[in-house]
């Protein structure tokens, strides 16, 4: 896609090699990622030393113990702190990520029917180790030598990231299933203990009834809590690995990226944790308007907090101004953790969408009877996201429109 916006090529004098190297220094926290020089070929993960495999969780343990075990298995001690940070941020960081619902559509541990959920622990599973550093089959593309190759390059980067994320997510789904089964066994044991010593005719039936009730009242909420931690780790780990390799690759070609014209058609693409272009030195537009320096500084503040490389825009950044600026927070606006939770709920609901259940309970006291939602995920997802929206407003579950990309000609 060629966009002929004039005969003058934007100046790249300020984006010479020395400033590019300084930009990397400013944005990069070496304590998080170790020795970058050892990864100069970009063929191995910057996180390859941190998490290779995760063991199966305890056969049976309380959700609180499982949560701490998951933190240790993922080597994700920063996870609870980051989730707390997401409670005080308003940006949508996650809804542009692919949901990959097909990975969950046959996962019976996510069934809305408690009997289905309980049946998943009727047989003993074999102990399994999970490779959490699985790589995608599509390699990170190299930047083009000429601006004419930029649109195709940006699409290839996006495709490569999507393949990488899906490959990793397949391993994470297996880990999620084993944690779900540990919760089920814990609730099963708790229900059995409550009937010990009781003078009742059918203690097993009583225990099963209590287990079904626990599944409805507690199980889905505990699964959602573990899933928030698990998928925050997935998204951050893959995005960090991919983005730092991408930044190192793109920062070596400032002249090419100075000819890029890039438009984020939706604001959530701009605030998203993943950006296919990190050295965006040409003309950049946000929802059809020129990107402001303050907006760039604000999203870079979040990126720095998350250990991600900053987005650099040579024509937007202001001389002698900081690269980051803390955004304001409003309790009346959606929160980042709400966007994450909504995104995860789409995964957890995939089984119910593919395998709809006959409604067992409806509200009979209303002329428009509706099915009662049995699954309790905890906090109201809708309340964490938005007030009643207008019909035209973009919702987190809506598929994002692709950004537009072109190049300037001399």
Swiss-Prot record:
- Tell whether Transcription is among the UniProt keywords: yes
Q: Give any Pfam family that matches.
A: Alpha_TIF
Q: Where in the cell is it found?
A: Virion tegument; Host nucleus
Region of interest (Disordered), ranges: 388-410
What InterPro entries is this protein classified in?
Alpha_TIF (IPR003174), Alpha_TIF_sf (IPR036538)
Q: Which UniProt keywords apply?
A: DNA-binding, Host nucleus, Host-virus interaction, Phosphoprotein, Transcription, Transcription regulation, Virion, Virion tegument
The record's GO CC annotations read: host cell nucleus; viral tegument
Domain of life of the source:
Viruses
- List this protein's GO terms for biological process: DNA-templated viral transcription; regulation of DNA-templated transcription
Q: Which is an annotated GO molecular function term of this record?
A: DNA binding
**Endoplasmic reticulum among keywords:** no
Family listed: Belongs to the herpesviridae tegument protein VP16 protein family.
Subunit composition and interactions: Associates with the VP16-induced complex; binding to host HCFC1 activates VP16 for association with the octamer motif-binding host protein POU2F1, to form a multiprotein-DNA complex responsible for activating transcription of the viral immediate early genes.
Functionally, this protein is described as follows: Transcriptional activator of immediate-early (IE) gene products (alpha genes). Acts as a key activator of lytic infection by initiating the lytic program through the assembly of the transcriptional regulatory VP16-induced complex composed of VP16 and two cellular factors, HCFC1 and POU2F1. VP16-induced complex represents a regulatory switch: when it is on, it promotes IE-gene expression and thus lytic infection, and when it is off, it limits IE-gene transcription favoring latent infection. May play a role in the aggregation of tegument proteins around nucleocapsids during virus morphogenesis.
The molecule here is called: Tegument protein VP16 homolog
- The organism encoding this protein is Varicella-zoster virus (strain Dumas)
